[in-house]
A protein has these predicted regions:
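N-terminal secretory signal peptides that target proteins for export/translocation
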Residues: 1-18
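C-terminal subdomain of alpha/beta-hydrolase-fold enzymes, centered on the catalytic histidine
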Residues: 516-671
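Serine-dependent carboxylesterase/thioesterase catalytic core
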Residues: 115-190, 361-367, 393-549, 597
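Flexible, membrane-associating and regulatory peripheral segments of lipid-active enzymes
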Residues: 38-102, 107, 113-116, 123-361, ...
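C-terminal motif of bacterial Sec signal peptides marking the signal peptidase cleavage site
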Residues: 33-36
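Short amphipathic alpha-helix adjacent to the substrate-entry channel of hydrolases
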Residues: 375-391
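Short, solvent-exposed loop/turn elements at domain surfaces
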Residues: 70-77, 122, 371-372, 404, ...
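Active-site catalytic pocket residues across diverse enzymes, especially alpha/beta-hydrolases
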Residues: 381, 385, 422, 449, ...
Length: 677
């Protein structure tokens, strides 16, 4: 790519220069469009639900459902092999009679499997019969797993097979129930099977979600994850579900933190009030059960019959289900091309309810992007129990068409307002230990939280003191909030990834020209700038920061704010970590763009005065998704946690940072304003 200087003074032949011009514009399109273009789908509906018993029980065999070989062996021992050719109910009842005389693990397992097969056959016609048989499967699987009088081998594949039978029988029963009833915590159900009556109370066992948060439920097994590399599941008992959040009282100001149709993981477990004793079938009549809803992000195991048992969980599919919405894919383009239309959309977002005691990690996206760009890292980070037990992840959405210092000012205000809403009494210490993670331009937005402006930032706007600038109240307030600020005392650590600390050569004459054609500058910015120039002739020169109206302009190497940010000393309580992408030497982009990630040169992304710096072999669009970058962020979060936990035990240490936080997002002491004409 030609540099700005070369483009201005080149004496190359016209055809060569035209080719370079075309290449520059093409690079603009590829560079800017790619981050906003995620995968077509994040989750797709399967033709049939995923079922771990499919191969074992020959779901797709020409001869139909068949018991496993070990169950066939049990049937042969009791002379029941010839009873397979029927609906399965008679076979189950005959096997159950043998089992009552000899209640051993093998017959428990065989009864569970035969009952499950019979239930699947009955489900297409007689759903009450199917529910009855699924209930029998649940009881036998439960007894196989937990009856204290049985001797079982946990290394035997049948042990895991019994878990699968329990889970699949419960899921299949829930599918039947969901066709007729809404499963919501706090509700009660009356279920009639062929021979029994069940009183089912649905209870919510999470401290995060409330009964009214549940709008609808989907089965995680119905969906295949497409847009996320790794899928995180936990193996145990229960049915993983996707819960779609109900939009609650919009008058609650905290409601703005949650995106519409947010989905979250749930694991459902059925607990019988009374389980038949060993060797006994479940009697007819009425039975009471609890259908328990657990949050697998906070509850990994539960007590069953005096034993701690892990929950079956799926953390990734609910995330992919939420991301699979066309409206989310439109956000990057809207935020870049027309920042004005972002009004009401920008701000801080959560994918879980606020959790007191957990440290917020705020992830800030880059140019022509949105929080979706963080989902790969987020999915990987929260798979670690230590991370999800101590951290909560927040995301910042902002219009990327405007200069990054304007976005930084808005984020400063939004963080302050969030503190007021979430912790009005200021008693929550975790909110004084925020970690900011910024990719690309988001790193610059984050870095502007780490130091106090003094007059240095204003001097990139004008050499005339601000108290002499004439402007009305709103325009003056905006100037002061954007160009005068203090280091954010709630932020303790920042991580910048693929950040153009010295600008990017891709922000050259051609890309900046194209950006001005693409981006609609916010009307408030235009009116404010026009008023300032009209009221203050001669106070602002051509190099003033006020003349920079788009994000592409703000990322140019000659942007006057970048040297100020490099020279500014960060607050004494602040830690800074840096991650740099470098493409392999043989890559075509490396040969064209030089050493770096293809968009940001190494010399621009590299920093000397940081706590740590990691070089990752990745291009600009993938550096924050690269496994080594994710591992580095996880390492930093563990270090952050260790330092916080160790601090009270160090009597010689001072406070980690000032405890005073300006909740109103005030700037440094305001100078006296000049009168407006």
């Amino acid at each position: 790519m030609p540099t700005e200087r070369a483009l201005r003074g080149s004496t190359l032949p016209v055809r060569c220069r035209a080719a370079r011009t075309g290449a520059a514009i093409l690079c603009l399109i590829l560079t800017l469009a790619a981050p906003g273009c995620g995968p077509e789908r994040y989750a797709t509906l399967r033709k049939t639900p995923q079922n771990p018993l499919e191969n074992q029980l020959q779901f797709t065999a020409i001869k139909g459902l068949q018991p496993s070989e070990r169950t066939m062996q049990v049937l042969r021992r009791f002379g029941l092999e010839q009873q397979l050719h029927g609906d399965g109910r008679d076979l189950y009842e005959q096997l159950e009679a043998f089992h009552e005389r000899e209640p051993i693990p093998e017959t428990h397992y065989a009864c569970a499997e035969v009952a499950y097969l019979a239930a699947r056959r009955a489900a297409t016609g007689d759903q009450k019969q199917a529910l009855d048989l699924y209930g029998a499967t649940l009881v036998h699987a439960h007894q196989f797993l937990f009856d204290p009088g049985l001797s079982r081998n946990v290394y035997d594949p049948e042990f895991r097979g019994a878990c699968n039978l329990y889970n699949q029988a419960l899921e299949s029963a829930l599918r039947i129930v969901l066709k007729q009833n809404a499963l919501r915590p706090g509700a009660s159900l009356q279920l009639e099977t062929a021979t029994r009556h069940f009183d089912v109370e649905i209870v919510e066992r999470s401290n995060a979600w409330k009964n009214e948060d549940f709008a609808r439920l989907e089965f995680a097994s119905d969906y295949e994850v497409k847009g996320l590399t790794n899928q995180y599941r936990g193996y145990g008992l229960g049915v993983p579900l996707i819960a779609v959040r109900n939009c609650r009282d919009e008058s609650d100001p905290r409601e703005k933190f949650y995106p519409p149709d947010l989905s979250f993981p749930v694991t459902v477990f059925l607990r019988f009030e009374v389980v038949p004793a060993r060797g006994e079938a479940m009697p007819g009549g009425s039975h009471r059960c609890l259908l328990e809803f657990y949050d697998p992000l906070s509850t990994a195991d539960i007590d069953i019959a005096g034993t701690r048992v892990p929950l079956e969980s799926d953390l990734t599919t609910p995330l992919a289900y939420f991301l699979d919405k066309p409206s989310l894919a439109e956000l990057p383009t809207l935020g870049f091309v027309n920042p004005d239309k972002y009004q009401g959309l920008e701000g801080l977002y959560m994918v879980q309810p606020y959790q007191p005691g957990k440290i917020p990690v705020l992830m800030v996206h880059g140019l022509w992007s949105s929080p979706i760009t963080w989902m790969e890292m987020f999915n990987d980070l929260r798979s670690a129990k230590e991370i999800r037990d101590h951290y909560q992840f927040w995301f910042y959405l902002y219009p990327t068409g405007q200069p990054f210092w304007v976005s930084a000012s808005q984020m400063r205000r939004d963080l302050a307002q969030a503190r007021v809403l979430l912790d009005p009494s200021r008693h929550e210490p975790a909110l004084d230990h925020l970690v900011l993670v910024g990719h690309s331009m988001g790193g610059l937005v984050s870095k502007l939280q780490s130091f106090s402006s003094g007059d240095a930032v204003w001097h990139t706007v004008s050499k005339q003191p601000i108290q002499l600038v004439k402007a009305d109240g709103d325009v003056r307030d905006n100037l002061e909030h954007v160009y005068f600020f203090q280091a954010n005392p709630a932020v303790r650590r920042i991580i910048t990834i693929g950040t153009p600390h010295r600008g990017s050569k891709f922000a050259n004459d051609f890309t900046r020209f194209a950006a001005h054609k693409l981006v609609t500058v916010p009307q408030a910015m235009i009116r404010g700038t026009q008023e300032i120039y009209r009221e203050n002739p001669g106070a602002f020169d051509a190099g003033s920061l006020l003349n920079i109206t788009t994000s592409i302009d703000s990322l140019a190497p000659n942007c006057p704010l970048l040297p100020v940010m490099l020279a500014a000393p960060r607050a004494p309580w602040m830690h800074h970590h840096n991650i740099v992408g470098v493409i392999e030497d043989k890559a075509l982009v490396r040969r064209v763009a030089g050493r770096g990630d293809g968009i940001v040169e190494y010399d621009s992304a590299h920093l000397d005065n940081v706590d740590s710096e990691k070089v990752v072999p990745a291009d600009h669009l993938h550096v924050h998704r690269h496994p080594l970058a994710v591992l580095e962020v996880r390492r930093i979060l563990r270090q952050h946690l260790a330092e916080i936990q160790a601090w009270p035990r160090r009597p010689d240490a001072g406070p980690p940072h000032p405890r005073v936080y300006q909740a109103s997002a005030e700037i440094a002491p305001r100078p006296a304003a000049a009168e407006t004409r």
